[in-house]
């Protein structure tokens, strides 16, 4: 099952990246949120969700997701998320 879980996360992360490239923020929000219900440890799903909110100037929503990530991710993954969001 672990192999399928990793394959799912890899596929979802590629989809989320492409949705960002196309500025399809509504689909990005929906799919990232769904991915996080299945794989709450998916740091990249948090990244794309937060980044899309930032692109739309929805700073309160971005801050809310960042707070959720802090609660749900291990500290090292949360720190990686913070670093990636600073780029």
Show where each model-derived region lies.
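TPR alpha-solenoid repeat register
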Residues: 11, 45, 78-79
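Canonical tetratricopeptide repeat
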Residues: 14, 48, 81-84
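Terminal, low-structured helical/coil segments at or just beyond the last alpha-helical repeat
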Residues: 63-87
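Alpha-helical adaptor scaffolds
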Residues: 1-38
């Amino acid at each position: 099952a672990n192999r399928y879980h990793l394959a799912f996360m890899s596929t979802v992360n590629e989809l989320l990246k492409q949705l960002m490239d196309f500025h399809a923020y509504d689909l990005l929000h929906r799919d990232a949120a769904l991915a996080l219900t299945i794989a709450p440890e998916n740091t990249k799903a948090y990244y794309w969700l937060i980044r899309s909110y930032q692109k739309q100037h929805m700073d309160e929503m971005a801050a809310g997701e960042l707070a959720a990530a802090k609660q749900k991710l291990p500290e090292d993954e949360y720190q990686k998320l913070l670093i990636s969001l600073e780029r």
